[in-house]
Amino acid sequence: MSIVYINIFLAFIMSLLGMLIYRSHLMSSLLCLEGMMLSLFVMITLIILNNHFTLASMTPIILLVFAACEAALGLSLLVMVSNTYGNDYVQNLNLLQC
């Protein structure tokens, strides 16, 4: 395993830890989720290029499409919550409240 793969894997782990530690604000959770998607994209692209998988060459593009949809939904949810409650705390997203 080369140093590039280890660095990308560490970037994914750091984003995952950031998601677990800074989960009180929605904006920080969205940024950590985008970091995870970026590291997954780079890792999948490098694996496909190094191993010459021609059949899986569309996989990074599909991952980018899902990441863009996730970012759009996350930002719209952030705008809705901040307009409704005035802050971006994740505790405001509890759907079981009356």
Curated annotation (Swiss-Prot):
What is any one GO biological process for this UniProt entry? Answer: ATP synthesis coupled electron transport
What membrane topology does this protein have? Multi-pass membrane protein
Keyword set includes Electron transport: yes
The GO molecular function terms of this record are: NADH dehydrogenase (ubiquinone) activity
Q: Which reaction does it catalyse?
A: a ubiquinone + NADH + 5 H(+)(in) = a ubiquinol + NAD(+) + 4 H(+)(out)
Q: What is its EC number?
A: 7.1.1.2
Q: Where in the cell is it found?
A: Mitochondrion inner membrane
Pfam families according to UniProt: Oxidored_q2
Enzyme class, first EC level, given as a word: translocase
Q: What are the TM regions of this chain, as residue ranges?
A: 1-21, 29-49, 61-81
Would you tell me the Gene Ontology cellular component terms? mitochondrial inner membrane; respiratory chain complex I
Instruction: Indicate whether Electron transport appears among the record's keywords.
Output: yes
| Record function comment | Core subunit of the mitochondrial membrane respiratory chain NADH dehydrogenase (Complex I) which catalyzes electron transfer from NADH through the respiratory chain, using ubiquinone as an electron acceptor. Part of the enzyme membrane arm which is embedded in the lipid bilayer and involved in proton translocation.
**What family is it from?**
Belongs to the complex I subunit 4L family.
Q: How does it assemble?
A: Core subunit of respiratory chain NADH dehydrogenase (Complex I) which is composed of 45 different subunits.
Q: What is this protein called?
A: NADH-ubiquinone oxidoreductase chain 4L
Q: What is the originating organism of this protein? A: Herpestes javanicus (Small Indian mongoose)
Output the lineage of the source organism: Eukaryota, Metazoa, Chordata, Craniata, Vertebrata
